[in-house]
Every structure is written in structure tokens, then in C-alpha cells.
Amino acid sequence: MAQAFQFELVSPERLLLSAQVTEVVIPGNEGYLTALAGHSPLMTTIMPGVVSVKLADGKTDSYVVFGGFADITPQGCTVLAESATHVDDIDPADIQHRIDHARKVLEDASSNEHRTKAEIFLHQLMTLQGAILPA
């Protein structure tokens, strides 16, 4: 049986989850990563995506996050999200609103650097939309 560790998912509004888990999959900026008990210390930024959690009792749960960072230690993992919600509570209109806003930011980009960042963010949102919402 996998060893459990403490996991917390926090948004500015509230603590979404504080539980003993055996595995957490996080959408890091360099790709998805899996945190397990005893993981080497790591701090990483996260991209919009789905945080998947395997609870100590074997149940799984998923949360949609929109940026932030993850702090992983051998004893636990904390995700501080800019915005987060349970996957079952996602409002398709909210995702579409974020995509529309990202498109506007892209149109108004004043430099190549801003344009590149806006393109990446828009792509991440559209990927997230395709992953969690039915076609």
C-alpha cells in the first residue's frame, strides 16, 4: 500500500481540500508531475489544468486550477492556486469567458513577449476546456 502524506489545495477564497493522500498529479509549467510521499523538495509554478488527487482511502478527486504554484516536500504537498474549483462545479461559461478574455489580451498585446505569453495562456485554456467539458 502506498504511503499517505498531507495535501492541501488553497485558493484565495478558501481551503478546498486538506487530506491525507497517496498521490497528487499537478499541471506544472514543464508538464504534469506526480507527487508521492517522500518526494524530493520542489517548488514549481502551475498552469491551468486539472489537479488529480488519490485519497488515502483509495477514492479519487479532481480540481480545476488556473495558475499558482505547488510546494512539494517529503512530508506533503501544498498547491496555492490563483483560482480553483472542484471539477464537478465547473461552469462552461466561466471557461469560455476566460478564453474570450485571453483572446482580447492577445489582440491587444503590445510586444512579442506579451503576445507569446498570451498565446501560451490561451492554448492552455483551450486544452483545459477540451479536457473537462463535453464536446
From Swiss-Prot:
GO terms for cellular component: plasma membrane; proton-transporting ATP synthase complex. One of its GO terms (molecular function) is proton-transporting ATP synthase activity, rotational mechanism. It is a peripheral membrane protein. Its main location: membrane. Pfam families: ATP-synt_DE_N (PF02823). The keyword Repressor does not apply. Keywords: ATP synthesis, Cell inner membrane, Cell membrane, CF(1), Hydrogen ion transport, Ion transport, Membrane, Transport. The keyword Transferase does not apply. InterPro entries: ATP_synth_F1_dsu/esu, ATP_synth_F1_dsu/esu_N, ATPsynth_dsu/esu_N. Produces ATP from ADP in the presence of a proton gradient across the membrane. F-type ATPases have 2 components, CF(1) - the catalytic core - and CF(0) - the membrane proton channel. CF(1) has five subunits: alpha(3), beta(3), gamma(1), delta(1), epsilon(1). CF(0) has three main subunits: a, b and c. This is ATP synthase epsilon chain. It comes from Brucella suis (strain ATCC 23445 / NCTC 10510). The lineage of its organism: Bacteria, Pseudomonadati, Pseudomonadota, Alphaproteobacteria, Hyphomicrobiales. The gene is atpC.
